[in-house]
Amino acid sequence: MGTQRNGYSKRETFILSVDVGTTSIRCHVYDKSASIRGSCSAKVSLLYPQPGWVEIDPDELWDGFVTVVKGAVQDSGLQMCQMESLGISTQRATFMTWDRNTGKPFHKFITWQDMRAAELVRSWNGSCTMKTVHGVMKMLHFLSRQKRFLAASLVVFTTQHVSLRLVWALNNIPQLRQAVEDGTCYFGTIDTWLLYKLTKGLVHATDYSNASATAIFDSYQMCWSGFLCSLLSIPLSILPKVQDTSHKFGLCDSSIFGVPIPIMCVMADQQAAMFGECCFDTGDVKITMGTGTFMDINTGSKPHTSVAGLYPLVGWKIGADVVYLAEGNAAGTGAAIKWAQDLELFSDVKETEAIATSVEDSDGVFFVPSFSGLQAPLNDPKACASFMGLKPSTTKRHLVRAILESIAFRNKQLFDVMLRETRIPITKIRADGGVCTNDFIMQLTADLLGRKIARPSHFDMSCLGAAFVAGLGTGYWRNQEELKKLLSTDQHFLPRRSKSEGEKGGLYRGVLQSWEKALQRSMHWYNQP
């Protein structure tokens, strides 16, 4: 898999794929060998109209989407009529509501980072209603042994979920409430909005991977959760139809790109990255290290019910084939590195590896990367970020090493809880995302996990995953085995073992234990998350 722009026939066709991330929109044109023929990207502007609010302007997002598609095709030297199909990958749980007749939004996109529903989250999680729900569901699970009741007994709302941010919007935006009463309201995550715009209002749909990340979808029954929607007074009538991940969603209106390109895939970004990494088999693991860390394991044909904070997701549904994932995340991975750069601990992120290896260890300094609390398996939104063990001998180099080590330590925590909870034998581990370019973090993660980790030649796995699904849908690629042969690996990181201890991560066992003490002291720091 590489980058190529010459030597094509006009009869050749190609796959377009767009990834709408938190900070950028990227489009690539792929050929049969999964080589990139052309690319274009644009920034996503985040808006902060009030403290804690994080929004995206829908018109600006749409303009950016159209721009990168046209730009990528132009960059490839190809023609739009050679684009066989379009795949779309998007950030999850960022949503908007709009008038189904006019397409006019009732508000801007409320992103997954938005905190406006924090008080609602605290209120609901501590309410008698939720305590009753948990009790009833535990009883139903005891009587029936059905895991979906166990899952319901463990439901805890967070601001990252769509659920209570949507409740906030329904409670606080009069035009939205009126539209719901009039039956003219549409709800949708970014993929749904793009489908609506691309088809000039003909399609109101999403796919199972995006729906499962909203926290108002029942992954066991494979439908919107009537129970949760009823509990939160969310009208089912505003929700989009849920389709297979590989599905002909419609045609791009010819007025947009000049030709009617079939839209053959919409997919959530982490699930798309999993597909792009060809993690098709039960036990395959993907670690994406970017703005945050997302660790996903393929759990096969059944959703995983977690008691430690792993989230059950639909990976994808292609025909009768449904693949589920269990996901753990650690927020603030990239944020910690960006913060250190802003503090001038280094000028270029590429320097961090050399800085970290320029000292033998962190000199007893530990960093806790909890700018947004701690997620699985600790699940403490009140945790604070901290440095511990500072002393007169501490230098910038020790601080940088401690920050990089903390990312690998959180990877170890997520991996351990994943092993403990799922009890699924690990078949392979692949890593992607911008932070995985750091060899120090990659090698330390391999050491701590005691596993070989493969790093791909290209890191834009969400885009590639959506392209793969779109291409399978039109027969551009025949099957998943063909896709595996197209995937190239930049480097394998093999675990180093301590000569004295002969155990995985043995060199770091004492350091990890000390870091975990620092972690405990950073927990429950704030009165409110």
From Swiss-Prot:
Taxonomic superkingdom: Eukaryota
Entry-linked PROSITE patterns: FGGY_KINASES_2
A cellular component term, taken from the record's GO annotations: mitochondrion
UniProt KW Nucleotidyltransferase keyword: no
Reactions it catalyzes: glycerol + ATP = sn-glycerol 3-phosphate + ADP + H(+)
Location of this chain's protein in the cell: Cytoplasm
Sorted UniProt keywords: ATP-binding, Cytoplasm, Glycerol metabolism, Kinase, Nucleotide-binding, Transferase
Principal location listed in the UniProt entry: cytoplasm
Enzyme class per UniProt: transferase
Pathway participation: Polyol metabolism; glycerol degradation via glycerol kinase pathway; sn-glycerol 3-phosphate from glycerol: step 1/1
GO terms (BP aspect): glycerol catabolic process; glycerol metabolic process; glycerol-3-phosphate biosynthetic process; triglyceride metabolic process
GO MF annotation: an example: glycerol kinase activity
Database matches in InterPro entries: ATPase_NBD, Carb_kinase_FGGY, Carb_kinase_FGGY_CS, FGGY_C, FGGY_N, GK5
Binding residues annotated for ATP, in chain numbering: 22-23, 291, 334, 434
Protein's UniProt keywords contain NAD: no
Function per UniProt: Skin-specific kinase that plays a key role in glycerol metabolism, catalyzing its phosphorylation to produce sn-glycerol 3-phosphate. Involved in skin-specific regulation of sterol regulatory element-binding protein (SREBP) processing and lipid biosynthesis.
Protein name: Glycerol kinase 5
Gene source species: Danio rerio (Zebrafish)
Gene: gk5
